[in-house]
C-alpha cells in the first residue's frame, strides 16, 4: 500500500451490532462472520495473525464480528458526499486492507488529490487501515 496523503476531511463513527444486523438484512447477507461472535472466532481464520498481532497493542479483539466490506465502502462515499455535497460520481474503486471490527471507532478520511479525484480510507484508533478507495467525480 502506498503512503496515504494528508487528509482534507474526516468523520469518526462506531459501527454497532444493530448496524451490522440491518445491513445484513438490507443486502440479504446472512454470513455469520458479521452476526455470530463464536463463528467469527472459530471459522475462516479469525482470529488470525491480524488479530493476534493487535491483541498485544490493546483490548482483545477475539470473538468479535467483522463489519461488511461494502458497508465500509458506502461509508467512504457518504463521508465524501457530506464534505462535498452535489458531486456526480463517475468511478469508484476500493480495496479492503484489514478487517474492520464492530464496536470500535472507525475514522473515514478523504483527500482531494485533484479537481475531480479524491482518495478515501478508513482507519481504526490504532491507525490500522481497513479500506482504501479512490473516486473520480464532477461538480
Language-model features, listed with the residues they occupy:
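Generic alpha-helix signal with a bias toward terminal, lower-confidence helices
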Residues: 27, 32-35, 45, 51, ...
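Generic detector of low-complexity/intrinsically disordered segments
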Residues: 53, 89-91, 122
Amino acid at each position: 500500500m502506498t503512503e496515504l496523503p494528508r487528509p482534507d476531511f474526516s468523520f469518526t463513527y462506531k459501527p454497532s451490532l444493530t448496524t451490522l444486523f440491518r445491513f445484513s438484512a438490507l443486502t440479504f447477507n446472512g454470513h455469520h462472520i458479521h452476526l455470530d461472535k463464536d463463528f467469527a472466532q472459530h471459522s475462516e481464520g479469525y482470529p488470525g495473525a491480524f488479530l493476534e498481532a493487535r491483541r498485544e497493542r490493546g483490548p482483545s479483539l477475539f470473538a468479535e464480528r467483522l463489519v461488511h466490506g461494502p458497508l465500509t465502502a458506502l461509508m467512504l462515499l457518504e463521508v465524501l458526499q457530506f464534505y462535498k455535497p452535489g458531486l456526480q460520481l463517475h468511478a469508484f474503486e476500493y480495496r479492503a486492507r484489514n478487517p474492520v471490527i464492530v464496536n470500535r471507532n472507525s475514522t473515514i478520511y478523504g483527500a482531494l488529490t485533484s479537481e475531480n479525484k479524491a482518495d478515501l480510507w478508513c482507519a481504526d484508533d490504532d491507525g490500522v487501515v481497513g479500506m482504501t478507495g479512490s473516486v473520480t467525480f464532477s461538480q
